[in-house]
């Protein structure tokens, strides 16, 4: 098939003064071949609350979407960055307010207090998410495939879910109470617990959604992607010398050279999970593999006590899908 560059479309809420609200912004990457593309937000500066959905192949071309939650848009610029190595394409699209630009607000009237509900063309939208790497690769965890329905209207709030594994219906999913969103629509989530071996063997999981606002049910399917698997290399680094006079120091874990980009990284100390760490999203390297960083902030007194800190990595390319690298303050330093 011929290499085709993607078209990129920023997606913004319809109207309303959202400067003090949390909003979800999107980026549609459409009509490209072959895989993969990478999507970052503000060149990676926005990494929390980012969801990039699996690509869908239709008529020989791929399409995917990515979303980010922002509490500062539109006063702070949010840009979707898309890279498609196969076509040497790099595209940056700023998410701008629709319906009249930055100064536009909803029409006001004596009896209305909320922004009008946006017209929902075709009714609700459905997205399906794979299990988290840690949950599926460590057999003791509770792995789930998740189906998310958004833009459910107040007039037709009831959503019905049906789940199938290799086209056989199952009845073990758990559906959460619907959540009202900032634009007066609802979000509904259903999660299907799955078995480690079912995911790893490539079984197909299908979520079927029905709602009176839909002309017909929507079906979304997901399975473990096929492709090259390469194990990550893991390196841990202590704080720089200049930081040792401060009250808090930073430890860094670099994970590089891995495929696919599904990976889990966390920090532990004395068997307990550390809370004060941040991970970047996986970034595509020049050879097509991925790398990411994890930074743990700890009190300097804990580092000075020579307590060991462990970077724990979960990836399907690793032996037993898991590796740990430990670091502590060296003697005499």
Curated annotation (Swiss-Prot):
Disulfide bonds: 27-80, 147-207, 253-311
Pfam families according to UniProt: C1-set (PF07654)
Segments forming domain Ig-like: 6-96, 124-223, 232-328
A GO BP annotation: antibacterial humoral response
Gene Ontology molecular-function annotations: antigen binding; immunoglobulin receptor binding
DNA-binding among keywords: no
Keyword list, A-Z: Disulfide bond, Immunoglobulin domain, Repeat
InterPro entries: Ig-like_dom, Ig-like_dom_sf, Ig-like_fold, Ig/MHC_CS, Ig_C1-set, Immune_Resp_Modulators
Keyword rRNA processing part of the UniProt annotation: no
Listed GO CC annotations: immunoglobulin complex, circulating
PROSITE patterns reported in the protein's UniProt record: IG_LIKE (PS50835), IG_MHC (PS00290)
Listed PANTHER family: TAPASIN (PTHR23411)
Protein name: Ig gamma-2B chain C region
Species assigned in the record: Rattus norvegicus
Organism ancestry: Eukaryota, Metazoa, Chordata, Craniata, Vertebrata
């Amino acid at each position: 098939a011929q290499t085709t560059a993607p078209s990129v479309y920023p997606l913004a809420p319809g109207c309303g003064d959202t400067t003090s609200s949390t909003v979800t912004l999107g980026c549609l990457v459409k009509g490209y071949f072959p895989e993969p593309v990478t999507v970052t937000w503000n060149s990676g500066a926005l990494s929390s609350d980012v969801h990039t959905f699996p690509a869908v192949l239709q008529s020989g071309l791929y399409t995917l979407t990515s979303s980010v939650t922002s509490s500062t848009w539109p006063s702070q610029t949010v840009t979707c960055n898309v890279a498609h190595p196969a076509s040497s394409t790099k595209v940056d699209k700023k998410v701008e307010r629709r319906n009249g630009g930055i100064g536009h607000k909803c029409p006001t009237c004596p009896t209305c207090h909320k922004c009008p509900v946006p017209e929902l063309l075709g009714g609700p939208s459905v997205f399906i998410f794979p299990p988290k790497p840690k949950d599926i690769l460590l057999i003791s965890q509770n792995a789930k495939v998740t189906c998310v329905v958004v833009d459910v209207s107040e007039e037709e709030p009831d959503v019905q879910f049906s789940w199938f594994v290799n086209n056989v219906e199952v009845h073990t999913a758990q559906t959460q109470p619907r959540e009202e969103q900032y634009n007066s629509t609802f979000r509904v989530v259903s999660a299907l617990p799955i078995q480690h071996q079912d995911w790893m063997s490539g079984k197909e999981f299908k979520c079927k959604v029905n709602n009176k606002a839909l002309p017909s049910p929507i079906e979304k399917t997901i399975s473990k992607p096929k492709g090259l698997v390469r194990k990550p290399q893991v390196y841990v680094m202590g704080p720089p010398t200049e930081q040792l006079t401060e009250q808090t120091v930073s430890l860094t874990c670099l994970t590089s050279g891995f495929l696919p980009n599904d990976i889990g990284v966390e920090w532990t100390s004395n068997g307990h999970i550390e809370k004060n760490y941040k991970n970047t999203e996986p970034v595509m390297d020049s050879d097509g593999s991925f790398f990411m960083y994890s930074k743990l902030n700890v009190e300097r007194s804990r580092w000075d006590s020579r307590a060991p800190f462990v970077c724990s990595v979960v990836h399907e390319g690793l032996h037993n899908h898991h590796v740990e690298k430990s670091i502590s303050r060296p003697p005499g330093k």
